[in-house]
Amino acid sequence: MPSVTMRDMLKAGVHFGHQTRFWNPKMKPYIFGARNKIHIVNLEKTLPLFNDALGFVNKLASSNNTILFVGTKRAAQKAVAEEATRCGMPYVDHRWLGGMLTNWKTIRQSIKRFRDLEAQANDGTFDKLTKKEALMRRREMEKLERSIGGIKDMGGLPDALFVIDVDHEDIAVQEARKLGIPVIAVVDTNSNPDGVDYFIPGNDDAIRAIQLYVGAVADAIIEGRQYAATQAPGGDSDGFVEVEEAGEAQA
């Protein structure tokens, strides 16, 4: 199973927390100390928790479960969209719509509308409309693409959430908790780890750190999915070649 090392985390700046005056006392067990009024995360505590989270993700993926990636802050958007796409998982990289989980029935209707508009754009329907009507539909489609494009193939509620920054994504975490959906999340020194099933203490702002978290989770999912494929009728162990390549790329 893919795993991370202390060196990986140091290079990515995982150990740099927030300013000491913004700390959350519940993160005290995971803080090594402070430097220049910045809390330093104890990576010896982070390492096993990070790998535990990867193990949980790998287990879910090996049972063909769905993990929804959530990262709407600017530093996380690109990595979340790219890595979720790479491992075939749904994602939310722009604003979290209230009720995205707890009001799934309404979200499903929006997905249907989005698919209808996509079909119209592809089959030439837009070309038969007036310029004004075609423009209005394209704008509607673009708006839906931003808000729900990453979950259009989710098919139903996810089996788990993987979240970058629990404070920024507090509504998503609350909805998951309400529905009993497990939450895997990166938790910085200014945040509260309560309510997170598998949390990774670390920097949730630096792009390199976010890329490390999201890339490692994607690798764990890919390996889990490939394991599931080998267990299916007609499965072939050749699928493990790609995981080795992914691991080399990460290193």
From Swiss-Prot:
Coiled coil: none
GO molecular function terms listed in the Swiss-Prot or TrEMBL record: structural constituent of ribosome
UniProt name for this protein: Small ribosomal subunit protein uS2
Ribosomal protein as UniProt keyword: yes
Lineage, uppermost ranks: Bacteria, Bacillati, Cyanobacteriota, Cyanophyceae, Oscillatoriophycideae
Annotated GO biological process: translation
Family classification: Belongs to the universal ribosomal protein uS2 family.
One Pfam family hit: Ribosomal_S2
GO cellular component: cytosolic small ribosomal subunit
Native organism: Arthrospira platensis
Keywords: Ribonucleoprotein, Ribosomal protein
UniProt cross-references to InterPro entries, sorted A to Z: Ribosomal_uS2 (IPR001865), Ribosomal_uS2_bac/mit/plastid (IPR005706), Ribosomal_uS2_CS (IPR018130), Ribosomal_uS2_flav_dom_sf (IPR023591)
Classification via SUPFAM superfamilies: Ribosomal protein S2 (SSF52313)
Record carries keyword Nuclease: no
